[in-house]
Amino acid sequence: RVEPAAREGGAGIGAVLVVAGDDLHRQAGGAGGFGGRGGFQAPPARGEDILIDIGGPERLSLHAATIAPESACTSMQLHLQVSPGDFATNWNAAQVIAGPQLALGANSPFFFGHELWSETRIELFTQATDTRPEELKTQGVRPRVWFGERWITSIFDLFEENVRYFPSLLPELSDEDPVAELAAGRTPKLSELRLHNGTIYRWNRPVYDVVGGRPHLRVENRVLPAGPTVLDMLANSAFYYGLLRALADDDRPIWTKLSFAAAERNFRAAAQYGIDARLYWPGYGEVTADELVLRELLPLAHEGLRQWG
């Protein structure tokens, strides 16, 4: 009932509502399969089916043989190309923004016929791609989808975490010798680094890429769902880019006054409760998301957009 009503009003919902039971057991892989090449690897890495267990106004509990449930999640990804020296500042700012950003943009309350979180996509994607069996969870092994655990001082902090915490799911090697490429005056593609990084799903992902022989770094913001309308998506994008600029340019960065754990709690609260979430912010304490946005964050976003020109 929800999908036709939304379509009639010109709005899209951030999670596919027509996933059927057979879809959850479809074999992954190939160009048309759920999850691409990684779909083959997730269940073997676990050694068991994937349990999806999400609370909310209604509770959903089911098992899936592959990571197919994550394919129901639709997102809008926002990219910002930055210099190496500015990467850490912008990534930290994006992490701070994630909670308020999601509170405003939550658009995936339904999945598999159940009303769950305001942005169910966050928890659904987290659980559907979790390759850890229970014993590894209790040992503190990190999940493939995660918010992170600390503020950073360099993009290398994140790439070092990739190597330290996450075994390769797709052990493919290229013939490139990066040192030889540099010595020859060419830009190394670092294919192994990029492939491995692509199997780790941070909500703000570091990206190294090469276009036309020129390397660059990007912050890939993966927080927002798609929809509900093009106008909403443009407004959410403007809020993100404006607030990101304002926080990144602040002489006393907000993350020096906000613990990383508090930023993660904001993110999860926003995923569960959307605009009704209560968020922590320095100088305000715990405050409703709408009050925080209206009193503090919209003016900052406006100033940030002005700085962008």
State the predicted function of each range.
Residues 12-18:
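Generic short N-terminal amphipathic or hydrophobic helices
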Residues 1, 7-10, 21, 26-309:
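Phosphate/nucleotide-binding catalytic core
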